[in-house]
From Swiss-Prot:
Residues 439-487 are annotated as: Disordered. One of its GO terms (molecular function) is zinc ion binding. GO terms for cellular component: host cell nucleus. InterPro entries: UL28/UL56. Associates with TRM2 and TRM3 to form the tripartite terminase complex. Interacts with portal protein. This is Tripartite terminase subunit 1. Keywords: ATP-binding, Host nucleus, Late protein, Metal-binding, Nucleotide-binding, Viral genome packaging, Viral release from host cell, Zinc, Zinc-finger. Belongs to the herpesviridae TRM1 protein family. The lineage of its organism: Viruses, Duplodnaviria, Heunggongvirae, Peploviricota, Herviviricetes. Coiled coil: none annotated.
Length: 785
């Protein structure tokens, strides 16, 4: 039986696969550029021909793809297309700039000047971009310095979309794109100076909204949030034997050269290991000699010999010490010893690398970290930790920092005794051995001292007979005879010491728990700061969503201008009479209170921006949820949120207060300045449009008149846009209202389409009524717009 043929891959899927493959190749090239900027320029000169070929390929690829990417930017962006465009632009700029610096180095031979130019040490910080956003309420200026600045600006632009013309948004987004070319286009690795994980993103907020809050406010939870979406952590583990493992398989080397390099590497590693062992020195012999002496006494005893109290005390203390040895492998012991050990590891790695370079190439390569080694050595500890090293991973640094924190706090004797109780046992064992060595283990009162020492060690473990630190006991309950004042004072002093010890133990346990909790909280921030961060998909996805919203508005106006019949009421004669007639007929009626919830949701839908589109998902949420995400992510003040929530309910369609626009001045913001007053004016205009269309449908019995947004239509696989009949709010002050009263059979705007332009709510409703009247009078079955 013949196998079934493989299923055909759709054209969009095939195109997406090709773009992903191309994106991987460009990312590889960008990563090579970043390495060559930091490597010995002699290495780049040896590969100059291949680098020029790669630069030419990137130039051809950019020239070939740029028209298609620009066309897609005007149609519908995706995070993939945005990322590919950013990488191509960065690869084209930096590749040719690196070639120029290599050619300059071939002439001058100045290594320091080469790194100064390639690393931008003499240039100002490139991550500063001035943004100017033109709105109906005035211009807004701000500066982009961090990745979260980009995300915040895009969220603010999304919230202000209804008072921003497409031309102003396009100019601002172009400046944002320039910043993202330098920030996101530089490959996968995020420069540390760009990322600030203490600023939560929109995804952080959405995650907190769907998880249990346990009584905490969203602002409090966001303050403790460490963002892992704009940039994501990449765990890096370095193997100390990588050079030894991969050197035998290095290409382009002769067998003799590889063998010579391996021999030199083994010798270098052996010398560094021997030097490290000599510097480390033998462990202190104090505690080990005590244990050896105790073990010798215990080994000399057997069951045929009598067990003295002193020997039994030694055995009991040795038991507690053995238990402590088994418990030593705690979390702290898994950390690196200290930062000096990491520095020693870096030195060993550098020594081995230099030895191999000398054996293979006869010279020491002048990489960036070697050419500027003096400057790097002058950095303080914080900067050195952020820069990192070649032989130590960020996780090793984090563990060393935590261990140093514990070591600093555990210098307190009480905490040290709580964490290492075996120290008490060793001290007690040392005292018992000293007394036995002095010949005092034969009986009498001296026999109580070893037993008291053993009981003290057991009590420190939470076991043993409760006794005072001096081994003294109070009178037994059945004892006869009067108790002297001296005995009472002695017992009271013992009780005070015991209570003091118990209080100190409880206090140290609580302090140690607080220390552990603090370390756990701070570890998350250390991991985000020191670990290697890679770019997430939040910024490309956010940029694409916001840009698509404004591109849809411009595209809608361009498509409707090419309709078969265009009726422009903005300058037509006789429109004022239509305005007066429709206004007077609608103001005599009120909106049915039962319709207020539905028109409130319609208001939220028109006010919301293009970024948060939860109402269009497969598992759609109501429009108020998407608007909630929009206003909360920009930090809208509570009184404005309350005003926005009750904007429709406050008017209710009663009286004439909801009709705020003058003739042919709908969505006009003349005389209004400031973002908040302009936003409030736009809300009033949108409320007027919603109430007017609701009353129009109920008064003239023409069915529901759909209010739509220009970005409600997405391109089909054939690149077509379908706009159903209805009244569209374009948010453009020059032509805010467009009514599509007829469209083609496929739903696209074409020769059979009838479009009405207007700047007045009542006159455009009159035009819609004129178009519907013949069909309604003749009992036509066409659905109303």
């Amino acid at each position: 039986m013949a196998a079934a043929p493989p299923a055909a891959v759709s054209e969009p899927t095939a195109a997406r696969q090709k773009l992903l493959a191309l994106l991987g190749q460009v990312q590889t090239y960008v990563f090579q550029l970043e390495l060559l900027r930091r490597c010995d320029p002699q290495i780049g000169l040896g590969k100059l021909a291949q680098l020029k070929l790669n630069a030419l390929q990137v130039r051809v690829l950019r020239r070939h793809l740029r028209p298609g990417l620009e066309a897609q930017a005007a149609a519908f962006l995706t995070p993939l297309s945005v990322t590919l465009e950013l990488l191509l632009e960065y690869a084209w700029r930096e590749g040719e700039r690196l070639l120029g610096h290599l050619e300059t180095f071939a002439t001058t031979g100045d290594v320091s000047a080469f790194f100064t130019e390639t690393m931008g040490l003499a240039r100002p910080c490139p991550y500063h971009q001035q943004i100017r956003l033109q709105t109906y309420g005035g211009d807004v200026r701000m500066e982009l310095c961090f990745l979260h600045d980009v995300e915040n600006f895009l969220k603010q632009l999304n919230y202000c979309h209804l008072i921003t013309p497409p031309s102003g948004a396009t100019a601002a987004l172009e400046r944002v794109r320039e910043f993202m070319v330098a920030a996101v286009g530089s490959g996968l690795i995020v420069p540390p100076e760009l990322s600030d994980p203490s600023h939560p993103c929109a995804v952080c907020f959405e995650e907190l909204c769907v998880t249990a809050n346990q009584g905490a406010t969203i602002a409090r939870r966001l303050a403790d949030r460490i963002c892992n979406h704009v940039t994501q952590q990449a765990q890096v583990r370095l193997d100390a034997n990588e050079l030894r493992r991969y050197l035998p398989h290095a290409a382009g080397l002769s067998d003799a050269a590889r063998a010579r390099a391996l021999c030199v590497l083994d010798q270098a590693l052996a010398r560094t290991a021997a030097g490290g062992g000599a510097r480390a020195g033998p462990p202190p012999a104090d505690s080990s000699s005590v244990r050896e002496e105790a073990d010798a006494l215990l080994e000399a005893h057997d069951v045929f010999q009598a067990t003295t109290p002193g020997l039994y005390a030694i055995s009991e203390l040795r038991f507690w010490l053995a238990s402590g040895d088994r418990a030593r492998h705690s979390t702290m012991d898994a950390f690196a010893d200290n930062l000096n050990a990491l520095a020693q590891r870096e030195l060993q790695q550098e020594t081995a690398a230099v030895a191999v370079e000398l054996a293979l190439f006869g010279r020491r390569a002048e990489h960036f970290d070697r050419a500027f080694g003096g400057h790097l050595a002058a950095l303080d500890m914080v900067d050195a930790l952020i820069i990192g090293g070649q032989a130590t991973s960020p996780d090793d640094q984090i563990e060393a920092l935590i261990r140093a924190c514990y070591d600093h706090h555990l210098t307190t004797p009480l905490l040290r005794r709580l964490v290492s109780p075996e120290q008490c046992d060793e001290e007690a064992l040392r005292r018992v051995l000293a007394r036995l060595g002095a010949g005092g283990a034969t009986g009498g009162a001296e026999e109580e001292e070893p037993r008291a020492a053993a009981e003290e060690g057991g009590r420190r473990r939470g076991a043993g007979t409760p006794a005072s630190e001096d081994g003294e006991r109070g009178p037994e309950p059945g004892a006869q005879g009067p108790e002297s004042w001296g005995d009472i004072a002695t017992r009271a002093a013992a009780d005070v010491r015991e209570r003091r010890r118990l209080y100190a133990d409880r206090l140290t346990k609580r302090s140690l728990a607080s220390l552990g909790r603090c370390v756990r909280e701070q570890r998350g921030e250390l991991e985000k700061m020191l670990r290697v961060s890679v770019h997430g998909e939040v910024l490309p996805a956010t940029f694409a969503a916001v840009a698509n919203g404004f591109a849809a508005r411009a595209r809608f106006c361009a498509l409707t201008a090419g309709a078969g019949t265009v009726i422009d009421n903005r300058a037509a004669p006789g429109v004022f009479d239509a305005h007066r007639f429709m206004r007077a007929s609608l103001l005599r009626h009120q909106v049915d209170p039962a319709l207020l919830p539905s028109i409130t949701h319609r208001f939220f839908e028109l006010v919301n921006g293009p970024l948060f589109d939860h109402s269009t998902h497969s598992f759609a949420q109501p429009p108020n949820t998407a608007l909630y995400y929009s206003v909360e992510n920009v930090g809208l003040l509570p009184h404005l949120k309350e005003e926005l929530a009750r904007f429709i309910m406050g008017a209710g369609g009663s009286g004439a207060d909801w009709a705020v626009s003058e003739f042919q001045k709908f969505y006009c913001f003349d005389g209004v300045s400031g973002i908040t007053p302009t936003q409030r004016a736009a809300w009033r205009y949108i409320r007027e449009l919603i109430i007017a269309t609701t009353l129009f449908a109920s008064v003239y019995r023409c069915g529901e008149l759909e209010l739509r947004r220009p970005d409600c239509s997405r391109p089909t696989s054939e690149g077509l846009y379908r706009y159903p009949p209805g009244v569209y709010l374009t948010y453009n002050s020059d032509c805010p209202l467009v009514a599509i009263v007829e469209s083609g059979p496929d739903g696209c705007i074409g020769p059979r389409s009838v479009v009405v332009y207007d700047r007045d709510v009542f006159s455009i409703l009159y035009s819609v009524l004129q178009h519907l009247a013949p069909r309604l009078a003749g009992g036509g079955s066409d659905a109303p717009p």
